[in-house]
Amino acid sequence: MSLQIDAVILAGGMARRMGGDDKGLVELNGKAMIEHTIERIKPQVKEILINANRNQTRYAEFGFTVLSDEHTGFLGPLAGMITAMGHTQADYLLVVPCDCPLLPRDLVARLLAAIKANDAELAVASDGEREQPVVMLLKPSLRESMTAFLEAGERKIDFWYAKHRFAVAAFADQPNAFVNVNTPEQKQRLAAEINQS
């Protein structure tokens, strides 16, 4: 029996460092940032969900289910993850941010391999130096634990997953895979990299 793996693209943040622009909709090389992300992960998963707290109609134009946080008040990535975990029947949920256009094309395979090798509940990606807390594969059954953590006033994803059996999948061979866009300057640099990839 093959596993079902769905994905959620997190596009629910305030993007303060981008002057408040909705990062997923910022154009990069003629496409919305989220389109680059969709292209990278679509072959790796069954269903894609988009977590967005504004411009929902615009996000719906990409052809996927759009979910807004069940917990109101822009509470960060955990709120979007909790919402998505409540809307999937999959065995695993892939979590990625909307502003990482160079995500690995073998992201799911390597995260899943790390889970199996370590008998873990979730796997987090690493660029070889640092863990990437918003790039992970996890069991949706962890929703209750994550909800309790958020409702206790906690926000840091790495503090949450440290409480669970987690594995790290290293992508040191793809050092730019998790480069994201927080400033207009980073956007310019990334545009040049995409042209070369």
Curated annotation (Swiss-Prot):
A GO cellular-component term linked to this record: cytoplasm
Keyword Nucleus applies: no
EC number: 2.7.7.77
Similarity remark: Belongs to the MobA family.
Gene3D superfamilies: Spore Coat Polysaccharide Biosynthesis Protein SpsA, Chain A
Name listed for the protein in its UniProt record: Molybdenum cofactor guanylyltransferase
Record note on quaternary structure: Monomer.
Cofactor(s) recorded in Swiss-Prot or TrEMBL: Mg(2+)
InterPro entries the UniProt entry points to: MobA-like_NTP_Trfase, Molybde_CF_guanTrfase, Nucleotide-diphossugar_trans
Gene: mobA
Location(s), subcellular: Cytoplasm
Enzyme kind, highest EC tier: transferase
Source species taxonomy: Bacteria, Pseudomonadati, Pseudomonadota, Gammaproteobacteria, Alteromonadales
GO molecular function annotations of the record: GTP binding; metal ion binding; molybdenum cofactor guanylyltransferase activity
Binding site for GTP: 10-12, 23, 51, 69, 99
Organism: Shewanella sp. (strain MR-4)
Family matches, as Pfam families: NTP_transf_3
Catalytic activity line of the entry: Mo-molybdopterin + GTP + H(+) = Mo-molybdopterin guanine dinucleotide + diphosphate
Classification via HAMAP family: MobA
This protein's record includes keyword Ribonucleoprotein: no
One biological process term in Gene Ontology: bis(molybdopterin guanine dinucleotide)molybdenum biosynthetic process
Ranges in coiled-coil conformation: none
The record's note on its domains: The N-terminal domain determines nucleotide recognition and specific binding, while the C-terminal domain determines the specific binding to the target protein.
Stated role: Transfers a GMP moiety from GTP to Mo-molybdopterin (Mo-MPT) cofactor (Moco or molybdenum cofactor) to form Mo-molybdopterin guanine dinucleotide (Mo-MGD) cofactor.
Residues bound to Mg(2+): 99
